[in-house]
Amino acid sequence: MTTTTGVVQHQEDRSLWSSYRRHGYFFREAAMITIGLGVILHLDRVLLGDALALNHLVTVSSDRVLLVPMTYAAITGILVWRRVRFATKRGRAVFRASVVYIAGSVPLHVYISYISLNVAIVTWFPMWFSYLLLIVVYPVFLTTFWRLRYEPATKTD
């Protein structure tokens, strides 16, 4: 007679792909890197002003670097959209807003980095927008990403 429960007998799939899915395709890490780079670029704009920031730090090259984790976070954010656990409806709304923000930023940054090759487009956004992102939006997004939990991945995911 066997007395072991199904939980103990359960063999977890330890493949690389399974680990990748179980960790939400590493969306959290990509999103935090993306927002972290955004903090650096917006902080440069606020501290140095548009003229200095655009000449030295906010460049097409830095925008292309930002675009890599941003695109990855946008794609994986959409993939894990239904697998994220939320404690409150507010948490769900903030997570969805963060994915929409990141995914919506990709076309703008593709345009800046590969089509117009002109980062001066960022001056279209008033300086208060950078302050809003730095003081309110980015801290909320980073906190949300830090607390992110996923539902167990199923074979159909």
Task: Describe each PLM feature range.
Residues 4, 13, 28, 67, ...:
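Short amphipathic alpha-helical segments that mediate assembly, nucleic-acid/protein binding
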Residues 48-63, 106-133:
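Interfacial non-cytosolic loop connecting adjacent transmembrane helices
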Residues 24-32, 38, 42-45, 71, ...:
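Alpha-helical membrane-associated segments of multi-pass integral membrane proteins
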Residues 17-27, 58, 62, 84-94, ...:
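Membrane-interface helix-boundary signature
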Residues 75-111:
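Loop-to-transmembrane helix junctions at the membrane interface
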Residues 1-39:
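Cytosolic juxtamembrane helix and N-cap/initiation of the first transmembrane helix
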Residues 31-77:
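Hydrophobic transmembrane helix segments
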